[in-house]
A protein has these predicted regions:
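Cysteine-nucleophile amide-bond enzymes
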Residues: 1-122
Length: 122
């Protein structure tokens, strides 16, 4: 399934760890292209917000870029072998990056949006 990961700053009050995060990489969201349209999943408030964004033929990547977001187009992995590892659970971070990694099915180490961006562009 086609996916877009968008990286951005956070409007308003800001991120509690904002001073430690790279500019333009303070938050990330993911959008998935389904048969019926684009679905966006945002973990900004600590609870995944899911919303239908646009019809499937809409150029959502350009829309995000026009809004000032940095984007990476990728694919959601479907052939992931599930393996339970207690140690992984201990170092897993419940943030926007953790949610995007879980949805994409990627296992490499990244905690911040910028680390995720660098890994997606390798």
């Amino acid at each position: 399934m086609k996916a877009i990961v968008a990286f951005m700053n956070i409007e308003g009050k800001g991120h509690p760890l904002g001073g430690l995060l790279k500019d333009n990489f303070k938050h990330c969201i993911i959008a998935l292209q389904s048969e019926n349209g684009w679905v966006e999943i945002d973990y900004r408030i600590g609870i995944p917000e899911v919303r239908v964004m646009a019809p499937e033929d809409f150029d959502l990547n350009s829309h995000y870029q026009d809004a000032g977001y940095i984007t990476v187009e990728t694919e959601q992995s479907r052939n992931i072998k599930f393996s339970f590892n207690l140690f992984c659970g201990i170092i897993s971070v419940s943030n926007c990056v953790g949610l995007v990694k879980a949805i994409l099915g990627v296992k490499y180490f990244s905690v911040t949006p910028y680390q995720l961006y660098k890994r997606l562009n390798k």
